[in-house]
Amino acid sequence: MKIGNREFDVTNRTYIMGILNVTPDSFSDGGKWNTMDHALKHAEAMIADGADILDVGGESTRPGHTPVSAEEEAARVVPVIEALRKHFDVPISVDTYKGSVADVAVQAGADLVNDVWGLKYDPEMAGVIAKHDAACCLMHNKANTEYNNFLIDMLAETQECVNIARKAGIKDERIILDPGVGFGKTYEMNLETMNHLELFQHLGFPVLLGTSRKSMIGLALDLPVDQRVEGAIATSVIGVMKGCAFVRVHDVKENKRAVLMTEAILGRNIK
């Protein structure tokens, strides 16, 4: 799979997506990187630590977050994306569910659109992605936790995202799927999702796993958000073993080492 100018071996490897939130209220790092200088320094550190992609977010998607306008979100992410493109040779993702933000972000240099609503929030989003021939990550999400059969329904609802993408003209080779741990799911459902990540492989697309610092880890370990690194590493290891092509993390160095060690144990060619 090609993202930006880089080829990703999504059938044999697991890559690190480093999180760069330029928001004042993200659940774990809001306000830390929302100045240009800090954002660039953090990006440089994540690349040095082994990040393969940087995911830039301008609006928190944590439960109870304060929504921002598309104009404000774009004003946060576009200058950062432009600066990243100027200073670093690394694929860039924009974390947004608004088509207008995705449009200007891709024009600014983003290679991938990471949509936490899987094209179901903004009817313009799929067309924007198709127009630019951008890569996209489509996450399973819903506004409640009501399912008839959780796993079957989750897979069917994720397939709906794929259908929207295809109808808009997005090519299959541009699509990544995210099971959406922490979104539209109870604690028990999140654990069940982790236990059955391999089911997402049957949909025929690379899978991205995003669990870093999330409440599932906090509930399992009874730890605050700033003490969940080890829990996130455990989920990343499971992700590698279940065939995920990407893991989206805050703590790049720790997760990168865990991923590489797991790949070595599994006999994957990492040299």
Regions found by a protein language model. Give the residues of each.
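SAM-dependent methyltransferases
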Residues: 1-13
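Active-site-adjacent loop and "lid" segments of alpha/beta metabolic enzymes
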Residues: 3-5, 28-37, 41-42, 61-83, ...
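N-terminal binding-site loop/beta-alpha segment at the start of enzyme catalytic domains
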Residues: 9, 16-37
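Conserved hydrophobic/aromatic pocket- or pore-lining residues that grip, position, or stack substrates
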Residues: 20, 50, 113
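Catalytic domains of carbohydrate-active enzymes, especially glycoside hydrolases
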Residues: 41-57
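Conserved Motif II region of HX4D acyltransferases
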Residues: 180
